[in-house]
Amino acid sequence: MAAIRKKLVIVGDGACGKTCLLIVFSKDQFPEVYVPTVFENYIADIEVDGKQVELALWDTAGQEDYDRLRPLSYPDTDVILMCFSIDSPDSLENIPEKWTPEVKHFCPNVPIILVGNKKDLRNDEHTRRELAKMKQEPVKPEEGRDMANRINAFGYLECSAKTKEGVREVFEMATRAGLQVRKNKKRRGCPLL
């Protein structure tokens, strides 16, 4: 029997950890060098609740230069991973300011998983010192949960691509969200533009 196919699109600020999360999940390796993404696609197989699912992972550019290009990724999306970085309170602020309006415009009714990336940096001394200089601190778990409720996300998870903590759980939750949608409505995902 062929695997069920689901399309996952990941969005969030530039350098918030989107590509690392996808590569660690799909290839089990952590990229040490940061190269800004324009568009990348990965395929990964996952088994959830006894179902084989083939996930098409669509990586997107967070940089503003690509705001007009990014919507090309959205048609037929089954689930959105909306990311921020735990070491960047500004990236969390952009969730309701930028990412939620964009996603809800192009993908109404598509479930959103809010993901706090770079969890390993929450207690990192250097990170805390740098943020303190700007009178900031790492994002707290409850701030992430509150934001997930505020944007009506399907769920909220935190992970670290570097240590791999929580990575699999993110994609399991995303797959479940994508599968649930199929049961609830016949027309799937984002409409064509």
UniProtKB/Swiss-Prot annotation:
Key word Nuclease present: no
Residues carrying Cysteine methyl ester: C190
Classification via InterPro entries: P-loop_NTPase (IPR027417), Small_GTP-bd (IPR005225), Small_GTPase (IPR001806), Small_GTPase_Rho (IPR003578)
Keywords assigned by UniProt, alphabetized: ADP-ribosylation, Cell membrane, GTP-binding, Lipoprotein, Membrane, Methylation, Nucleotide-binding, Prenylation
Propeptide residues per the UniProt entry: 191-193
Residue numbers carrying ADP-ribosylasparagine: N41
Lipid-carrying residues in chain (S-geranylgeranyl cysteine): C190
GO cellular component term of the entry, any: cleavage furrow
Residues given in the record as GTP binding sites: 12-19, 59-63, 117-120
GO terms, molecular function: GTP binding; GTPase activity; protein kinase binding
GO biological process assignments: actin filament organization; apical junction assembly; cell migration; mitotic cytokinesis; regulation of actin cytoskeleton organization; signal transduction; skeletal muscle satellite cell migration; small GTPase-mediated signal transduction
Major subcellular location class: membrane
Keyword Membrane part of the UniProt annotation: yes
Membrane topology according to the record: Lipid-anchor
CDD domains listed in its UniProt record: RhoA_like
Localization per Swiss-Prot or TrEMBL: Cell membrane; Cleavage furrow
Motif Effector region, residue range(s) on this chain: 34-42
NCBIfam families: small_GTP
Family affiliation: Belongs to the small GTPase superfamily. Rho family.
Function: Regulates a signal transduction pathway linking plasma membrane receptors to the assembly of focal adhesions and actin stress fibers. Serves as a microtubule-dependent signal that is required for the myosin contractile ring formation during cell cycle cytokinesis. Regulates apical junction formation in bronchial epithelial cells.
Record protein name field: Rho-related GTP-binding protein RhoC
Species of provenance: Gallus gallus (Chicken)
Gene that this polypeptide is encoded by: RHOC
